[in-house]
Amino acid sequence: MAAAEKPVLSRYRDRMDKAVSALKEEFGSLRTGRASASLLDQVMVEAYGSTTPLNAVASVSVPEPRQINVSVWDRGVVVSVEKAIRASGLGLNPVVEGQNLRIPIPPLTEERRRDLQKIAGKYAEQQKIAVRNVRRDANDDLKKAEKDGAIAEDERKKMETEVQKMTDDAIKRIDEALKTKEHEIMQV
């Protein structure tokens, strides 16, 4: 019976891993004072009658630590790309040079660094909640399986302990990622 239930636990482990991965993606979009192509991943551009991701209309490169270059493929979309970057809330001011946009990354102020730390903390807390929700779902499913007679009580308790270990591990990885990101944000 235990072998039949193991895939259930691996399914929950996968969901917890996805929460940690999602956090790392969200952290990639936080500006740290260093140029990063992922900084513009969330930018959406009004082009061709619809809203499109920036990477669908241009290529993004990082030639220097404090500069991002955006090469727009269609000259008619350059103004839309510039507007989208300015409106993104990242505090960036692109300089248009033909079909290219040069985006200098200004150093962050102390106040902005503190704000970014708070935002990173919120992202981490959202993913911790997601992990705890997965734990709750797993425990509910285990109790249901016990009630239906698929597993014994001692097996359920053993599996709940395993689910708790998976939860603790995922939350530990989230905390480590947050600590790393906060350190990165505060470096001048």
From Swiss-Prot:
A GO molecular-function annotation: ribosomal large subunit binding
Q: SUPFAM superfamilies under this entry?
A: Ribosome recycling factor, RRF (SSF55194)
Q: Which UniProt keywords apply?
A: Cytoplasm, Protein biosynthesis
* Disulfide-bonded cysteines: none
The entry sums up its family as follows: Belongs to the RRF family.
HAMAP family with a match to the protein in the record? RRF (MF_00040)
Q: What name does this protein carry? A: Ribosome-recycling factor
Q: Which organism is it from?
A: Caulobacter vibrioides (strain NA1000 / CB15N)
